[in-house]
Amino acid sequence: MNPNQKIIAIGSICMVIGIVSLMLQIGNMISIWISHSIQTGNQRQAEPISNTKVLNEKAVASVTLAGNSSLCPISGWAVHSKDNSIRIGSKGDVFVIREPFISCSHLECRTFFLTQGALLNDKHSNGTVKDRSPHRTLMSCPVGEAPSPYNSRFESVAWSASACHDGTSWLTIGISGPDNGAVAVLKYNGIITDTIKSWRNNILRTQESECACVNGSCFTVMTDGPSNGQASYKIFKMEKGKVVKSVELDAPNYHYEECSCYPDAGEITCVCRDNWHGSNRPWVSFNQNLEYQIGYICSGVFGDNPRPNDGTGSCGPVSPNGAYGVKGFSFKYGNGVWIGRTKSTNSRSGFEMIWDPNGWTGTDSSFSVKQDIVAITDWSGYSGSFVQHPELTGLDCIRPCFWVELIRGRPKESTIWTSGSSISFCGVDSDTVGWSWPDGAELPFTIDK
């Protein structure tokens, strides 16, 4: 075969290979096009179903949390959540926080918390024992999850806060600013809707737990004035994030701070902290027109910390060990009361739930049920109430729940920071168990050494 014939033969072979390759590519493209057409057709057929589902979800997304039901009858408390945020924060990106609380809509429960603008085990966690700073913000994450930059959403700039859901949107209340002129910023669905200026210019502050909603209106209690003497206390009624009514309590010799409020049969009951002179807890109950009654829990099973040993109670402030205090809660059932309190009488350690069947009105110290929550050898802290509405649970009553803050770090431990994790429980009329669910983190961290 001469050179020209070789060239022609090689060229012919290359052309055949090229034609075959082109045909294969064309076949592949046709196959992909057919497959895509089938998938697109299937998606188009499914679209009406998908749209119907979305429309249905939107149709049930907005309700009114009536709050007209009574509290559910309960015999004990079932563990609901534990976030383990300090343990996780030794290696993970977890916020330095205090004052966590829980609130539920008709669709979900969320943990709200006041950050310090810092992460655990980081240099900016230094000095976070301070309560009020311009770096503090209210944020929230799904209940039971450790609060981190990856699962949390910003709510408000705040060093004192509250939040609740009326069935349509979240209402948040965030207080920030100087001690002598702080302002509460109200947001509804994330949009600023109103503000409340400090009226006594002495550390305006609010609940550090959820506000309470009834029939589309939400209610909160605020304090302005001395932490160790007579102060001023106001109830605010809000609709879609705007204040529509307020009333100042006529409460001489009473001291209300950090109230834990809940709806019950269309009215609101708040159990608060007396930081002035009471080792039992003051309460205020009111209807939707803000007509109110006030008192102290009469039981000889005292609920504050510090406090004296249980003894004879009073329907006014019990003065022994009455100064200072800690945020707490109770649930009223007729003349009876579930009291949540630290186990220790003089430090924020341990936690227990006690049922006093006559404690709302009676002054003796007898009780019939005690359920352990945290051992006295482990740190606790603030505690507060929240509820789950029938629109969430499907029950015909309002389920009472509570959370406990488990404070770690300064001032009791050798760290540069102060933070906490949280646990929560809900009332049930079935089997429960007492145990200890402590924070469980091993300190100090690397940053502390």
Curated annotation (Swiss-Prot):
This is Neuraminidase. GO terms for molecular function: exo-alpha-sialidase activity; metal ion binding. The keyword Lipid metabolism does not apply. It holds the Pfam family Neur. Intact N-terminus is essential for virion morphogenesis. Possesses two apical sorting signals, one in the ectodomain, which is likely to be a glycan, and the other in the transmembrane domain. The transmembrane domain also plays a role in lipid raft association. Ca(2+) binds at residues 274, 278, 304. Keywords: Calcium, Disulfide bond, Glycoprotein, Glycosidase, Host cell membrane, Host membrane, Hydrolase, Membrane, Metal-binding, Signal-anchor, Transmembrane, Transmembrane helix, Virion. Residues 71-449 are annotated as: Head of neuraminidase. GO terms for cellular component: host cell plasma membrane; membrane; virion membrane. The gene is NA. It comes from Influenza A virus (strain A/Chicken/Shantou/4231/2003 H5N1 genotype V). Its cofactor is Ca(2+). It comes from the Viruses. Substrate binds at residues 98, 132, 257-258, 273, 348. The influenza A genome consist of 8 RNA segments. Genetic variation of hemagglutinin and/or neuraminidase genes results in the emergence of new influenza strains. The mechanism of variation can be the result of point mutations or the result of genetic reassortment between segments of two different strains. InterPro entries: Glyco_hydro_34 (IPR001860), Sialidase_Influenza_A/B (IPR033654), Sialidase_sf (IPR036278). Glycans are attached at residues 68, 126, 215. It catalyses: Hydrolysis of alpha-(2->3)-, alpha-(2->6)-, alpha-(2->8)- glycosidic linkages of terminal sialic acid residues in oligosaccharides, glycoproteins, glycolipids, colominic acid and synthetic substrates.
